[in-house]
């Protein structure tokens, strides 16, 4: 699907905007602080229910307003879908799909698979394991129908188990939680392992094109010892968990390690190379989704020119065009993106929250 129309009301510094969009490349050009990143963030929020620069709703609602409103029209091969999201300062959300309320944010995420590339996105590579778990979980969410429910239930059970660890004195008192937790943990870990294995060749091929000077390897670590039943791990670590008052092993501790020439990528690659690797991973993930399901991602790229020279920008642009996906790119100057433009592209100018084409 592609986003054919976007309406923004009271989001960041944007009072009102009504944008007719290209199914190909859409460029947002403006000075720092003009609001171009806010447009990308509005699209992201419409598909995720939250902004990527702040988790606090009050910070993305325009000054002295009570709520933001986002609305979009998605065009698929056979039908058009209308989607909307309203969120107030208390964080209460209302999701509307095709004119009906009561929908879940997960439904928006399913309708709008998207890949986000920002200057802060290096956390995928040099941040904590939670960022790499999120990378795998994006793929599992879009490839396994039961993943979201299973992961939601797992988080609920872990929260309850951690609370119980403060109260119990014997492991037997935890068995009611672990009886539900264990099969969920094993299923989620299986899905993650299968996904990381299935996408490995796509990642290797794309990374080879972007970073041919390195040999990159990928490994999934499930969050507890190999060849060990999760039930045994939970029982054996009970005393330590009780002392820590949290569950020290499980899918919530998994990681997806990426190494270049045998060393962690964050210790080996320059910032420009890290950005190329991040782009390669996002592209590989989007292309894998298209091949497996026929669905295409939306790509959101903030500050396209940062960290990349002309040759690397050209390589990224050509790969994005080859996906035949909808792409949104922000840049300070039109000179940085003009060579990516074609007859189907749209160029928007952003100034103090006002957007013109």
From Swiss-Prot:
Belongs to the RecF family. Keywords: ATP-binding, Cytoplasm, DNA damage, DNA repair, DNA replication, DNA-binding, Nucleotide-binding, SOS response. GO terms for biological process: DNA replication; DNA synthesis involved in DNA repair; double-strand break repair; SOS response. This is DNA replication and repair protein RecF. It is found in: Cytoplasm. Signal peptide: none annotated. ATP binds at residues 30-37. Pfam families: SMC_N (PF02463). InterPro entries: DNA-binding_RecF (IPR001238), DNA-binding_RecF_CS (IPR018078), P-loop_NTPase (IPR027417), RecF/RecN/SMC_N (IPR003395), RecF_2 (IPR042174). Gene3D superfamilies: P-loop containing nucleotide triphosphate hydrolases (3.40.50.300), RecF/RecN/SMC, N-terminal domain (1.20.1050.90). It comes from Salmonella agona (strain SL483). GO terms for molecular function: ATP binding; single-stranded DNA binding. The keyword Nucleotide-binding applies. The RecF protein is involved in DNA metabolism; it is required for DNA replication and normal SOS inducibility. RecF binds preferentially to single-stranded, linear DNA. It also seems to bind ATP.
